[in-house]
Amino acid sequence: MEIKEVDDRAELLRYTNNIPLLGKLVNHQPLWSTNPKLKSFSLEKISAPDQRRVQEALVVKDLLNVLIGLEGTYIRYFNDYEPSDPETPIEFKIAKKMDPSFKTFSRRIVRYGKQYMILTRAYEKWSDTSFGMVLQRFAYEIRRFLEDVYLKTLVERLERDFNKVPNFSIRELEQIINETEVNKQMELLYNIYEEIFREIEERRTNQSSQEDFNNFMDSMKNESSLHLRLMVAFDTTVYPVPKGGAILKIFQQKILENLGDRSSVMFLKKLLNNISQDYCTMLYEWLTQGILNDPYQEFMTYDDLEGKTDNIFDTRDRAWDTQYFIRKDVLLRDCDSEEDKNLLFKMLRTGILLKVVRASLQIPTIPSNSSDITIQEINDFADLMEGSNLELYVDKCYSRANEIFLKLFFQGYDLINVLKHLQQIFLGYQSGHNVLKFLTKNMGELTKHYRNDNNANYDKLLQNFELERQSENPNNLMRQLLMIQFDTETLPQVLSHYLQIYPEVPENNSANDDSDPLMHANNFKNMNAILFDELSKERTGAYHGSNLELYTPKSAIYHLKFDINIPYPLNIIISRTCMIKYQIILRYQLVLQYHSRLLDETWMDLNKTPSWKYRGYSHTVKRRIVRATRVLHAKMNHFIKTIMEYFNQNVIDKEVYSLEKCYRNPTLAVAIQNELEGGLTNIMTNRCLSDLIPLQLQIFDIVYKFCKFIKSMRAKLCQLDPVLYEKHKSGMMKTLNEGYRTNNGGQEDVGYQEDAALELIQKLIEYISNASSIFRKCLINFTQELSTEKFDFYDSSSVDAAGIERVLYSIVPPRSASASSQR
């Protein structure tokens, strides 16, 4: 061979700022295609049988070079290979004139050199921090294997035998490679590399935004049937590089594929344990301390507020419900199926509970003796992923987190006492009479029609409320935090938003389709357009059609509401959603109490006012006005009191009893949240607050107008009898007579007139008869709607059923009662 002079110097690269941790820092060797050092000896000249050993020795020497990523004389890189270009494919070409048998051996052995070069290129690239700690550690494991195992075998066995054994052949070279586990392990590493590379390429070539949207829609469809508190908030973003669990999942799959090969499984498990060390640390810290130390976004839990300075103690914010997500892109294999939602929920919830404890106590870590349960560090990730080990480990951590969390809330913050105070205020228990006392003292102001710009009257109400609160026990935190407000929306409007008791979409609207329009969105832009359209229709009232009663001006009582901004950390259990439900329940009770007070006040008029107690009326007035008014008033009063009794005793008491039972031996924080939200939801969705509200509003309106009519009857009754008229002509009746003169065109009082009295009697009888007829019809409709026979889910043995039956038999008119019983 003729030696050529080639400039072959090793030197450091000039620009090394962006080179990964294990990246190449020196220049590449000269290529044969551009700078050949030798002029190769022709293989044709050594193809004779007696020269075959010489050719074999040359080929073996080339193969030893190829196995460490270098080209030889007769086995070279392709001419277009450029080592500085990472996108250039790595391929070797074999001399055409090589002995066919040597060429066959060479093709089989060359692939190990190709794999060595590809894996070398991979660990140089993946050692960058942008690929995350798991893939970075895998890059280190590749490098360690190539240097400590692969190259060691080449140097200590193959090169030594080639140099010292005279008859060392190409067959022996292949045999030694196959006898060791090196080739099998190299093959496994290369297969894993291919899987990771394929995943990276798919992410690079796919449209990430569309993939994100598809994942988001899948999550919406899959989670639509899950319980509110068991839903897991997913971050459906598809990241450009697979990280964390996405890499570990590939290793887990490879272990499953090689279960029949014990040595391969042991190698893969050891490799998996090594590359998962940082991940195990993150998992352990999250499940035992609620600490999320994820600098490269590869852990399954994602903190949406990381790096933000928002106040976590803001009572109006639901940060603890929305701060943490599960990255769907980096889930482990055992957490990736639809059946694993419960496991993911526990993992997410465990860290959140512990984070709340640390933030509340302002401590960096939770002492290990805070619970009776001891959690061991994760030292064998592969073993943790086998069978149900992960589920058992998470259950143990979840139980410990709940124990610490509940201990803080029940012993430290006295949660039971706080909830009792809320029940007293919002559910009408004990101290709730203070709210009712405020209602009684301000009946006049609350009867006036609500005006958003009339702040003077409402300031007076606020002052009265503050005076009432100053007399309260200062140790009652909830009472001190209680605020009175006037909502711009009436109670019926609020209920229509939350319970959809009114038909929200006209018949000709496309939203009446069986499927939700959002589910047919094609991308995020399309979804935004649909949501904007829905919001616009809601704001303009397009969905409410002919339900004008929603927007009819009403008394201030329909706008009155009480609110509490629950402080942190109590707002984690008593969320803003719970407080809105508390508000609605109390607003409904206030409306009932308001009309009950109206009826009580008019009862005083009916039974204490001289004009109503007068016994000298004619038979017609006694029977068809006085008696008919009292009977109708009694029916209205009985209806309101019956509904109040049913709502308090059969609806509220039942749910409060269930809540108190849950608080006695709490084991899970989510169970308390579910019971509280579920109990309030059951109260809110009771028929009194749902489909019966429109009928109740009609009845309330009739009651209000009839009470107003009774108030106006004092002067009118004095005009129906001459003796009563003369008796009250002076003194108290003076003002009423002036009003009567005004109503008669300002003429002077001409005394008792029988014709006018008879005409007034007829008008009063007609009004009372019409009011009684309308009330009776509303009552019949109410009882028909309340009838439980039309519901398949109705349980006749339940407490609620007994209450409904009592209400039916109590308020239904006699004829309707018999008809209802026959039906």
Curated annotation (Swiss-Prot):
<protein>
    <recommendedName>
        <fullName>Spindle pole body component SPC97</fullName>
    </recommendedName>
</protein>
<comment type="subunit">
    <text>Interacts with TUB4, SPC72 and SPC98.</text>
</comment>
<dbReference type="InterPro" id="IPR041470">
    <property type="entry name" value="GCP_N"/>
</dbReference>
<dbReference type="GO" id="GO:0007020">
    <property type="term" value="P:microtubule nucleation"/>
</dbReference>
<dbReference type="InterPro" id="IPR040457">
    <property type="entry name" value="GCP_C"/>
</dbReference>
<comment type="function">
    <text>Involved in microtubule organization by the microtubule organizing center, the spindle pole body (SPB). Probably part of the microtubule attachment site at the SPB.</text>
</comment>
<keyword id="KW-0206">Cytoskeleton</keyword>
<dbReference type="InterPro" id="IPR042241">
    <property type="entry name" value="GCP_C_sf"/>
</dbReference>
<dbReference type="GO" id="GO:0005874">
    <property type="term" value="C:microtubule"/>
</dbReference>
<dbReference type="GO" id="GO:0043015">
    <property type="term" value="F:gamma-tubulin binding"/>
</dbReference>
<keyword id="KW-0963">Cytoplasm</keyword>
<keyword id="KW-0539">Nucleus</keyword>
<dbReference type="GO" id="GO:0005824">
    <property type="term" value="C:outer plaque of spindle pole body"/>
</dbReference>
<dbReference type="GO" id="GO:0005634">
    <property type="term" value="C:nucleus"/>
</dbReference>
<keyword id="KW-0493">Microtubule</keyword>
<dbReference type="GO" id="GO:0031122">
    <property type="term" value="P:cytoplasmic microtubule organization"/>
</dbReference>
<dbReference type="GO" id="GO:0008275">
    <property type="term" value="C:gamma-tubulin small complex"/>
</dbReference>
<comment type="similarity">
    <text>Belongs to the TUBGCP family.</text>
</comment>
<dbReference type="GO" id="GO:0000930">
    <property type="term" value="C:gamma-tubulin complex"/>
</dbReference>
<dbReference type="Pfam" id="PF04130">
    <property type="entry name" value="GCP_C_terminal"/>
</dbReference>
<dbReference type="GO" id="GO:0000278">
    <property type="term" value="P:mitotic cell cycle"/>
</dbReference>
<dbReference type="GO" id="GO:0005822">
    <property type="term" value="C:inner plaque of spindle pole body"/>
</dbReference>
<dbReference type="GO" id="GO:0010968">
    <property type="term" value="P:regulation of microtubule nucleation"/>
</dbReference>
<dbReference type="GO" id="GO:0000922">
    <property type="term" value="C:spindle pole"/>
</dbReference>
<dbReference type="GO" id="GO:0051225">
    <property type="term" value="P:spindle assembly"/>
</dbReference>
<dbReference type="GO" id="GO:0005737">
    <property type="term" value="C:cytoplasm"/>
</dbReference>
<dbReference type="InterPro" id="IPR007259">
    <property type="entry name" value="GCP"/>
</dbReference>
<dbReference type="GO" id="GO:0005816">
    <property type="term" value="C:spindle pole body"/>
</dbReference>
<dbReference type="GO" id="GO:0044732">
    <property type="term" value="C:mitotic spindle pole body"/>
</dbReference>
<dbReference type="Pfam" id="PF17681">
    <property type="entry name" value="GCP_N_terminal"/>
</dbReference>
<dbReference type="GO" id="GO:0051321">
    <property type="term" value="P:meiotic cell cycle"/>
</dbReference>
